[in-house]
Amino acid sequence: LGERNFPAGSIRLCASERSWGRVLAVNGTELTVEQATPRLLREVDIAFIAAGSDVSREMAPLAVEQGCVVVDKSSAFRMDPDVPLVVPEVNAGDISSHGGIIANPNCSTIQMVVALNPLHQVSPIKRIVVSTYQAVSGTGAAAIEELRQQTAQMMDGREADITPQTY
């Protein structure tokens, strides 16, 4: 936001309980991380949520109820037909159809559609097949712990307890 000179009268940082009270520098100003409460959200125009799907599913509707527009980085709303999935360089106009929440695709999708959009404008692309390999850390602490346990099991010569799932 600082690099783009985004017009912000004030910035509030909110996070999970483990980060409350932490002090972070934003645009040369030290800000204390706070708990996201309905009262705080009433004072906010735009809430950027980048804390995982569970947090987004809980906090985004609460923020919208308090009058915020939510830009969500998680996968929570990406497949919701009522929530625009926006890459500003490609479909910024879709922002106007939001009902309070604007979803953001995952990082590999963003760079792919930014690169493909000019080609699509000249010759419409009908289908793309893509495989990506994502870091487990992007899924959160529970997934990192699961990978640690599976690695330990395999290093001990045991079969790893693996439950396939989509993150």
Functional labels for PLM-detected ranges:
Residues 1-167:
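N-terminal Rossmann-like NAD(P) cofactor-binding subdomain of oxidoreductases
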